[in-house]
Structure formats: C-alpha cells, structure tokens
Amino acid sequence: MNYKLTKKEATELIANKLSHFFGVSPEEATYEHYYKAVALILRDMMMQGRKEFHNEAKKADSKKIYYLCMEFLMGRSLKNNLYNLNLTKTMESAPKGFGIKLEKLYDCEPDAGLGNGGLGRLAACYLDGLASQGYFAKGYSILYEYGIFKQKLVDGWQTELPDFWLPGGDVWLVPHEEEAVDINFEGWVDESWDNQYHHVELRDCNTVKAVPYDMYVSGKDGKGISVLRLWSAKAPGLDMDMFNQGDYMRAMEQNAMAEVISKVLYPSDNHPEGKSLRLRQQYFLVSASVQDIINNHLRIYGTVENLADKIAMHINDTHPTLVIPELMRILLDDCGYGWDEAWKIVTDTVAYTNHTVMAEALECWPEDLFRRLLPRIYEITKEIDNRFRSFVWNSTGDAGKVERMAIVSNGVIRMANMSVAGSHCVNGVSALHSEILKKSVFKDFYSVTPDKFTNVTNGIAHRRWLCQSNPELTKLLTELIGNGFVYDGSKLEKFKAYADDAQVLKSLEEIKLRNKEKLAALVKKSNGIDLDPNSIFDVQVKRLHEYKRQHLNAFHILSKYLAIKENPDGDFTPHTYIFAAKAAPGYFMAKKIISFICSLAELINNDPDVRGRLKVVYLEDYNVTLAENLMPAADISEQISLSGTEASGTGNMKLMINGAVTLGTMDGANVEIHEAVGDDNIIIFGMSTDEVNDLKRVGYNPMNYYQNNADIRKVVDFINGGINGKVFPEIGGTITHHDPYMVLADFADYKSAQAKAEALFADRDTWNRMSLMNIAGAGRFACDRAINEYARDIWHTKPLRK
C-alpha cells in the first residue's frame, strides 16, 4: 500500500470529504469538520492497507494472532496515524491553505474511552507493536459508549461523569452489522442423544446482539495494520406484542437492559447488580469474539482441526478467561467434538498473561450467579474442574493441592485457576513478577506443569512515548545517533557514548526545561496554579491504589512542609510534586487518598511560608493525552509500590525514555530498569520482596514505627488534627494499626531517598548524565521487543512482513 500523498492530493481529498460527509465547503467548515475529514482520509487508507495485508496473510497461510482484553487505552489516533504513515508534514501544509492549523485539529479529538490504566495502555501499545513488526493481528474489546468516566474533583473529592467520547471518536470506527452475532444469557440447558450424537440447546434464554465496529491501528511506515474489533450490545428487537398491549415502559426496559452491557467500562461491583453486569460484559466480549474467530477460520479452512496451528488466542489478564469454556462449548455443541479432542484444541490455542499478584484482582465469581447467568458455560466449567481435579490428583496425590488448584471451590469460580489450567503458556510481565507467580501465586501449578510458565517483560510504544511526545529530544537523538532507534529501540544504547559530552548534556537540560515550561503553561490553564520550571518536577501518575502508595509520597510531602514551617530560614530545594490518577468508582479508600492529597495541596499552595519552595498539584482526569505532556517534563519518576505488589508497570518505562530518573523500590520492572542503568543512575529505597515477606512472617506492627520515628509521629498527628477543616481518620487514624502496604516501614528510607534525589539534582552535570543514561538504557522496554518474544516463545509464529 502506498501511503504517500502530495499536498495537492491531500487538499483535494479534504475538500471532497468536507463536501460528501458534512455538506460544507472548506470556507464553511469548522475545525471539527476538518479533524473528521482528515481522520476519514486516514481511515480509508488504513482500511485499504489492511485489506492488502489480509490478502497477503491469506496467500501466505500465516498464523493469525487474536488478542482479547477488557480494555484498550488508545488515546488519540490522528497524531499517531499521521506519524506512522509519514503524513504529518503533508497534513500540516494541506489544511494551511484553508487557514487551518494541524495542532488545533489534534485538540478536536477526544481520547477514546476504551480503557482505564496500565492494562489497557499496554494492549494499545501491543497493537502498535504488532503492526510495526509486521504480524497479522486483531484485538478484541467492547465499544464502551461512555468510556470509563471523566474525573471531576469537587472540593477534592472524585466525582464520576460520563465520558461522551463517541461523537468525536466514532469517525475512526467502521461498522460491520452484517457480521453481528447473538450472545445468549440465562435460560436452561436442553440435552438429548441421537445416534450417539449429543445435542445441546439453550432454551428460553435472553439474547443480546453483538455488533462489531473496527478501528485501524497503523504500524510504522504502514508496515502492517492492526485491527481493534469493538463489540456494541444491541437489543435483538422491540417486543411488539408487549408494546402494542400498552406496556411501553417494559418493552423499552428490555431493550435498555440488553444495551447496558456496552455502556461503561468496569461498572462498580459493590452490589449484586454490578457483579452481574461485569460478568455479562466478560461473557459478551468472549462469546462474540470466539464466534467471530471460529466463523472466520471455518470460512477459510472448513474445519477446526488445524485451529491451534493457524491461530493464537491470547487472553490479557483474567477478564477474558471465559474464552476457555466458550471455545469448548462451540467445539462440543456446534462442531460435535468429543471432550478430549476439544480440550486439546483449546489448550493448544489459548495463552494467558497474568498482570497481578493482588488477591482481589485474581477474579472469582459467585457460583450461583455464574450458574444462573451462564447455565451451559457453568456446566462446561464444572466438567473442566472435575477433570482437572482428577489430573492434579493423579499427578500429585495431594488433596490440599487439588483443592488449591481447583477451578470451582467454596462456592466460587476461580478465573485465574481456569486461565492457567486451560492455557498452553502462562507468562508474567517482569522478571520479578514471573518469579513471584512461580514461587507464590501459582506455586502449585508450577510444581505440576513447570514448562507452562515463562516471562515477557512489558514494553511501550516508544514511537508514541518518545518520538511523538518529545520531538525535541527525538531530533537531538537523530542528529547524534541516526534514526535507527525509531525502528529498533535497542539502538538507543548508542546514546551512552555522549554521557560525558558537556554540550549534549547541556542540550538535554535545555530540552527538559522547555518541556517543563510547556507543562507549566498547561497546568496554569487547567488548574490556575503557577509552577516553577526550575524546580524539581517530581511525578507520580498512575491508577490510584493503596499498593501504589501515593499516600507514602503524600506523607513525605507533609513531613517536608512541617520541616519548612519549623525552620523557615533553612535551605530547601524548590520541589514541585505532580499527581494524576483515577480511583475506581467503588474504591472508597482510594478516593479518600485523592481527597487527602488535594487538601494537602490546598494547604501548601496557599501558605506564604513555603512559597517558592514547595508546590503540590493534582491534575484531574488523567488520560493518554495528559500523559504525553507529563512524561517529557518529569525529573523524578515515582515508582514506590511495596516490593512484591506491582507486576511490572509501564509508566516507569515512559518516564525513563524521556529522561526522568526513577526513584523507586525493587519492584516490578524497576528491577530491570536498575539492571539497565546501574546503581548510579537510579535511586532505590525500601525493603526487598524477601524482606517484606520476612517482616510479614514475624508480624508487622506499624505502631512501632510511629513510636520510634519522630517524623512519622508529626505527620500522623498532624493528619489526625485535620487539614483545612477536613478529617482523614481512614488514613491517619488507622495507619498505626492497619498498614497493609507498609507505608510506615518504608517511610524513613523513602525520606532519605528523596534527600539523595535533591542533592543529585543540585549537581546539574551529574543529574543530566543520569538522565542521559536512562534514555540510552530504555530501548529494551520497547514493545517491539516484547511482541517478538511473544511471537517466538508463546504464539510460535513469524512476521508476515519483515
């Protein structure tokens, strides 16, 4: 596919789209019209590119990769696709003839409301990597009408508003109503035998129609085009009998209940209705996707005997685990396979990535809910459990192990156990995480099937997070080491040769300052707060969760504030702390931490005693676009989770590749960042995973730390006295006896690490060299590397285009 366009061709195409789709001339068109016109041009080009890519795959009979995830945090598509297809300059000049600036078109596009945190952003990065490396791949998720939510901070308290992203975002979507499939819930299972053939039908079920919409994702230079297929839930039709009998509300209510499935990502599950909706969402995604995959496969081959040879199905975390019993259902009920044959096809086809060691994230569903909502899937799951129990017993003779590894136990369905049992490969997402899976989380499984476990450390789309987000740094790198790093992140290693070049270090410092000035202007506009670009920009941006320990950061900030108040004439390095994070709607403690940080910010930012020394800002509604402005401006990357709780992290990689220095624990991918940059270019603090486990074993008593550390006492006592008239008993009042993530245990070491960071920052040459070494060491965290490892070790395939 030739993606080249001249300025004249682009101008004509824009005018054509404006006329045909919106009925306006270039003179009448708004910026919104121009944005959509350019998006439609790109969408059409990528659609054609995908068609050619598909024909090549068909001709080569290459293996197809299907990647299922509950969320894909795509961000904006216009800038990314223009960059990848090398059309940025053309589309800068073409609209200019109409008096239109491309930068303003970028701002017309909303972030696609299809994801929440690191899991979804990783999935989005992998679609980019798959396309850029030339693999034929398709992602599957749900078309969430209102996204996750828009975060609004009202007096410091997170309030959730619907994210109306589709009016501006649906221009990238191509509907395929002709490929819609039916998804069945509830009902009862009717089984019969006919000449040794087992007939199974679900009777009196509630049917929802899944309608697919395709979004295209370009690889660099258009080498490949990935597709993200998004399913929208539609009612099968209006019950006209009910409507004609005057029961209008009930007729409409049936439709609304069907379509609520694709309204919002991760509805609160603090109540039975929320749990039921989440399970419906998961089965809706899985059933629609598996039906689609099998339909496509049968169209090409006419059999599923060769399924595992021709496709790889990858489940990203436990949300799509129902792929396993759903594929079994199709093979048993629709294709007539016997159990053993079907199970071999499933386990040879499916692979699973685990993303957490947190117990609450290893999903379990109440057995009665599962049975009522998915009766046939429940039957199959029970049979999987029975046979797997027999397998474990025959392998080990250990009744305790059988029970721990069971899929159905104590009234719940354990999704993580089903994922491991039904996959041919299970991987963690950092070296440390994969070891924890083997030694702790899935210890029993590892003892029975050790060959099933492997590691693929996460990666990021470095072309987005470096080349697009930080054009000045990209320009400097290209001038010094060539543009090879754009295609192969490992080439960033060459930048190490300039670690002692004073002019290069000076240039790095100047680029960082300009990025900080840009962020300061954005914060002034959004928050009305003045930031000092010459201060340390200390950044913690990620999902709000207790294990990520945003409150440890806040405790230290409060400690510093109290120190300044005690000694206002002391020598303090100007320090700006930047937070951005959303809390899950039903996660009260996370919301309380946000409120605490906002109250702290209000206290500090309005106190003349600390003016010019300390500033705290909480940026609301954190998303990909905000992150693209934050990452290049950060000096310090806060990665301070309790060791042994973070699977990997990818924010640490995005900050690293933009020259931020990691201040963190030896957790997740921090371990590999430390390995990449060495002791001198990272600031490590806190207990190791082994030390955390040892402390838990002997009994962790946070009160000891409170009693023996004056700084901790001052901080906790101050919190308990209230901040700006607000009290935080859940934070200050409980932490001395309930501190599950050991904030007080790591506090003293964290404070020392912060002091070390300030001293290093004051030595500009040393700090700039540290920054350079982080950029040069970040290449190993490119998603291209991760994708090639998945392809080699798990999917067993090679790129279609090299």
Name what the model sees in each region.
Residues M1-K802:
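A conserved ligand/cofactor-binding region detector
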